């Protein structure tokens, strides 16, 4: 879901590593320890929560989180909570990073001091205000200046303890006066529409002929200001909660025209002062924020076409895609957008086959084949992550969940054994888990995605052709990816592959480490199994599996997934779990009588049906076949005064659902839309609001079967595994190429040097793989030209946007301290990425 701007789409995403907290304040009790967790928030909306780390003042989280950001935001915030079993969890402190400051910490481990949390630290939102001066002639013939203050609306106010019933006080304040008025309370909304006008007398009556129109005395206006305070009406004994304030000096009204603008709410001037840094501890984070500005598809045609023909270039090292891998500092930087682009256009197998064959030809020892972090290895890794994730889940998730839930001790290192544990019993537990994992993997070959099988076939053929005397190389070329880079890492760190929601506990993590090591060795088909382990206890344990049947099972599996023309007969028939989780749904009114209330339910989506049940594992209460989903669209907040709602439209009715946050709502809408995209009866129009009290709230039509009044969005690809935007990936490649332009130019110089000089070359030139200098130079020239053309388009867009930008508009409210930073970014830095 992109934020639409004139002429382009803006995509925001963030990748976060939450490391650890240190030196948290002690608990005021005899135990002194705390049970803490960390949340990730867009402004104050929670989008992710870590597991609870018990009894620690230095909790280690080690959790990763990635999301596409579906809306604008000002701060990326992190809150450390102390869990309380009997009361509401208490906040220890927070880290708030301004959006414009995220680039300062880009992809760097950084320690942040925790800050205190109070009403002033939580201020957010903006107010639409209009001020107008008017003259009133009294009965005695004198003139009074009166100020009309109109508060129209607010947006994005903070939600306090799960509710927001806001009202505003409007005060005309000066050295010798303070006159306050109050709006009505708006219930259950943090986007209140007030539209109330308040009048204040701002000058003493004076003769009409004394001064010109609106020429009131300077000492009056210079010392007066309008202050708007937002409050949350509360029934608690502690009184109403402060939400924020703004102050407008009346100097802005020296012109005859009215003043109308948006303002950001600010904390109070006399707000509570935070304690000195370090009092609350610190939090280690690594944040990567990306913002892509994507033009329409035709802008990218030259660069995209150049990239897509990479597989056909001879030699492949002279292709645009291979050149990108050469200039990037990390091969993975290039591999991620390249693989996604090639998958989108069906060119990933030819490209990987070409670069793999070239790498095999350069390899001298069959024992080191595909063992480095080359562009080939990184591209295959990325392909397996994208195309093989559902396969991985179907194969491993049930067994991984069983291991996590069993809590059986599998420690076989005599030094690590706990008191009372039996080495023989632990070894048997571990053997059973390894056998189970090995069995599900080697029996899963028929389910391996076709694109992976086609790549494995090309690896097998290239390796066998290069090392004809080594009969095992056709297996090791494939096992180095499917076992060493796919299954073994997923077993070792299941949370990174969404097999578990969080990091596992230390005992389970140790078990998975031992299982992963054994599976990796079994899959490698190493001739000397015992030498594969540094630890003697692992070598002893491996004797359980030193039988020919294990090697035969691995070879049969590798033969199956690397066979030419193999297709997956289960790809359509087999139910695949796509997404599941708790959400809140509104009763659909299937019964004639009964309340249409809201209930928390466990939702489950497969490629066959969308169901909900009371709890995970319970029988379904209701099922919607995928073919009956006619549209999936957002539901306007005003329908039920609830955020993050969407609707799943069926032939008879719509199912209204509330997700936990905006990120989760986007994820559900996207996956439901994708899986139902090919339905023949999909709607073209829908109702963006609910049908309540005998009419649609959006168009006021009275019939519940009335045709929709707004066009459906849709437009996503039908492939349930892959949601790839080709233009966005080309934009990312442009961004990378632009940032590495100096290395592209150096590579051009290296091509020229090699064309005319055969002697020793400069050290910086020797890092590039250049098999054909003339062909490589030709491609480089085209890449530089394509990047330059896009650079000009971005520069023109920045200039146009700069001219349109208005301080005080809804997009750039007054009081935004980042506005000058925004102006500087628009005039100095590239617009394609932050």
Curated annotation (Swiss-Prot):
Residues carrying Phosphothreonine: 110
Residue numbers carrying Phosphoserine: 77, 809, 833
Role played: Inhibitory regulator of the Ras-cyclic AMP pathway. May bind inositol tetrakisphosphate (IP4).
Positions of post-translational Phosphotyrosine modification: 66
SUPFAM superfamilies documented for this protein: C2 domain (Calcium/lipid-binding domain, CaLB) (SSF49562), GTPase activation domain, GAP (SSF48350), PH domain-like (SSF50729)
Zinc finger (Btk-type): 679-715
N-acetylalanine modification, residue list: 2
Name recorded for this polypeptide: Ras GTPase-activating protein 3
Residues reported to bind Zn(2+): 687, 698-699, 709
Keyword annotations from UniProtKB, A to Z: Acetylation, GTPase activation, Metal-binding, Phosphoprotein, Repeat, Zinc, Zinc-finger
Segments forming domain PH: 576-677
Site (Arginine finger) location in chain: 371
Record-annotated C2 domain positions: 1-112, 123-263
GO BP annotations listed: intracellular signal transduction; negative regulation of Ras protein signal transduction
